[in-house]
Amino acid sequence: MLEKLKKEVLSANLELVKQNLVIFTWGNVSGIDRDKRIVAIKPSGVPYEKLQCKDIVLVDLEGHVIEGSLRPSSDTPTHLELYKNFKEISGVCHTHSKFATIWAQINKAIPCLGTTHADYFYGEIPVTEKLSAKEFENYEESIGKSIVEKFKNINPLNVPGALVSDHGPFTWGETPLKSVENAAVLEYIAELAFFCELSKAQGQEIDINLLDKHFFRKHGKDAYYGQSKNI
């Protein structure tokens, strides 16, 4: 069932290792079939080197397992909240990549300090509010809700990622692989911003006109970066 989607999700999860975004069994990627309302996601605690297509778990949007003999990722409720609220996305990625997690642990949004950031994220990468003790009871679902709440006035396609307070980054995209690409870029710009903050000449936030130029030359109806079709 949904073999093509499972293969895409497997490939995206293995890409986490190639991009040095995960260690051990940390991290997960999912994808969704919007027509069937079924999500394919990495199983919980399975080493990447042992992960096979048959291991990818299928769940519905309420978290019920549709297919698979393994438990789905413990982060599944977070993924489901994002799919239910961000209708334009078809892939979600979660890592504990080093520099992005540093920003999450100090509970600070990543400011847009230059054009490398602006090429992918239209403005700062926000950090969610801290969860209350009551919210810990449904921890992973509460994480998803906290991201959705933070994006009430933010287009999730313009800022395809967030930092979860005290925890780490989640990213998303039009495909599972795109969510991983956004995770890799987030980690890179998190490192740049980290060292800018450490430097004596602290970076200033990017001029709004330069932000507009770099983001919209790659995204939107008037984009002109790259080729008109894939090569």
Predicted segments with their positions:
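Glycine-rich flexible loops
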Residues: 1-231
